[in-house]
Regions:
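Conserved beta-strand in the GNAT
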Residues: 64, 70-86
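Conserved GNAT-fold acetyl-CoA-binding loop/helix
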Residues: 29-52
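A short helix-loop-beta-strand connector motif used in the catalytic cores of GNAT acetyltransferases and
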Residues: 53-64, 81
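Conserved acetyl-CoA-binding loop-helix of GNAT-fold acetyltransferases
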Residues: 87, 93-106, 127-132
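Conserved active-site alpha-helix within GNAT-family acetyltransferase domains
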Residues: 98, 122-139, 143-148
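Conserved GNAT acetyl-CoA-binding A-motif
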Residues: 108-121
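A short, internal acetyl-CoA/4′-phosphopantetheine-binding micro-motif in the GNAT/acyltransferase core
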Residues: 82-93, 119-120
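A short beta-loop-alpha structural element at the N-terminal edge
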Residues: 6-26
Length: 163
């Protein structure tokens, strides 16, 4: 059963940049471990934290989901690609992922081509999430294009409206 909670979707706060990057990396790592067991992380925890701070938070358009001051989700976009959409374990099923996706699509410039996302083929929850929100499968990969070497599924959608 999906329960809606009061979620605040926002941008990164410059004055809290380092702390937010660290909290987001903690949430991201926990989410990957819990929701994608068996998918290896090719980086150490320190490397992942540096990537969140130095790449995701500085080069991508980022939105954070917050409940009562706690970061419970993150989404980032680089051009047409939705690069990350993670919800903290224990917070899935509350509409947070949908709200983050909606914010990312609304944030995309009107001239941005069709939004795209790639998921690991074994991540049935992510595939179902995007398919239920209007994304359609347009291709697969054998894993040679990602650091995890996991087969993937690529999706795109023709509209930015998310129900």
């Amino acid at each position: 059963m999906t329960t809606k909670v009061r979620v605040h979707i926002r941008q990164i706060r410059c004055e809290a940049f380092a702390a937010e990057a660290d909290a987001t990396a903690t949430m991201y790592l926990a989410s990957r471990r819990m929701l994608m067991p068996g998918v290896r992380n090719p980086h150490t925890e320190a490397e992942t934290r540096a990537w969140m701070r130095d790449v995701v938070f500085t080069r991508h358009s980022v939105r954070l989901a917050e409940v009562d001051g706690e970061i419970v989700g993150v989404a980032s976009r680089d051009g047409v690609w939705l690069m990350n959409l993670y919800v903290k374990p224990g917070w899935t099923g509350h509409g947070i992922g949908t709200q983050l996706l909606r914010a990312m699509l609304a944030n995309a410039a009107s001239s941005t081509p069709v939004p795209r996302v790639s998921t690991f083929a074994r991540n049935a929850n992510a595939r179902r999430f995007f398919e239920n929100r209007g994304f359609r499968a347009v291709g697969t990969g054998d894993g040679s294009a990602n650091e995890e070497h996991e087969p993937d599924s690529r999706y795109e959608r023709s509209t930015r409206d998310v129900s």
